[in-house]
A protein has these predicted regions:
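Amphipathic alpha-helical "lid/sensor" segments that cap RecA-like P-loop NTPase cores
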Residues: 18-65
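Short polybasic/polar patches that bind polyanions
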Residues: 6, 38, 106
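A residue-level signal for conserved active-site and pocket-lining positions in enzyme catalytic cores
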Residues: 4, 41, 87
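Conserved small helical "lid"/interfacial subdomain of P-loop NTPases
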Residues: 1-17
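Accessory nucleic acid-recognition modules appended to NTPase machines
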Residues: 47-196
Length: 196
């Protein structure tokens, strides 16, 4: 949000890690603006686009381009567009959760692909930088829990999930559970950007 000038930048991650825990600040960026930012995404062209409807359409256009050609062009393997759309939709419904591959498959309508095919499709989405999962983590070095825990599911930008779910700012304001999960994903996206 800072890069799109929607954050004040008052709180510094560097200062927090250096021990300065005196955090204060105020922003007039309200919940409606947050819902819009979730659906618009952080795409450079969308951030500077003054026409709201055009800015909101960019993530959906990206998804369609991805499904129509990009996902097949990257390695020359022809993938089933319907399966890819259903996988992305399931991924969007499971955003910010530790959904396993079997959960994603069970969430698909109709006959899901085999476990190997699903793994290939998820790997293709990751290699195309469409998804960017947060690895399982446990503070105890020898804990087996981290080995058994699925990563937390995230798209590289939560607007992809909004596009796949046909979510609009208005719909998100009427579904605060989905709003919260997408907001969590946006926070992860921004923290990753700030950390780089």
């Amino acid at each position: 949000l800072f890069e799109s000038q929607k954050s004040t930048g008052v709180v510094s991650l560097g200062e927090l890690f250096d021990g300065n825990h005196d955090v204060s600040g105020f922003s007039d960026f309200d919940i409606e603006n947050t819902a819009f930012a979730l659906c618009r995404g952080g795409w450079p062209e969308a951030v500077v686009e003054s026409r709201v409807n055009v800015a909101l359409r960019m993530a959906a256009d990206y998804v369609e381009e991805l499904l129509d050609s990009d996902i097949n062009r990257m390695d020359g393997i022809k993938r089933n567009k319907t399966w890819m759309r259903l996988i992305m939709r399931s991924y969007a419904r499971n955003i910010s959760s530790q959904a396993s591959q079997s959960t994603i498959a069970a969430d698909m309508q109709g006959e899901p692909p085999s476990e190997g095919t699903l793994s290939d499709y998820l790997d293709a989405l990751s290699r195309a930088c469409v998804t960017e999962d947060l690895p399982a983590w446990n503070p105890r070095l020898r804990s087996k829990t981290a080995v058994r825990t699925s990563p937390t599911r995230h798209f590289s930008d939560p607007s992809i999930a909004c596009a796949v779910l046909h979510a609009t700012p208005e719909k998100l304001l009427n579904d605060f559970e989905t709003f919260g999960l997408l907001f969590e994903s946006m926070c992860i996206r921004d923290l990753r950007v700030y950390a780089d």
